[in-house]
Amino acid sequence: MSENHKYYYMKLKETFFNDSKILLLEQMQDGPLYILLLLKFYLISLPYNGLLLVSENMPHTFQTLAIVTRYQVGTVERAIKIFLKFGLI
């Protein structure tokens, strides 16, 4: 029995890691971890047109994002605050 899979694509600019916001983020304590978390958020949001949703009408919480990204809730909360401040999400 074959399974049907949906594939999504995300384009990053060639200069993504040279963007001033990403460079600032990278220099922070836990910065590289936050960059990976940001990319995970971008990928999680692909099926929902850029929204962080668990399903059609159910938004993610800090707890659910922590589970699906395999990070601690506190790390997710701190990262989201930084991403909002930088305008990354």
Q: What role is predicted for each listed range?
A:
Residues 1-89:
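Positively charged, structured surface patches that bind polyanionic biopolymers
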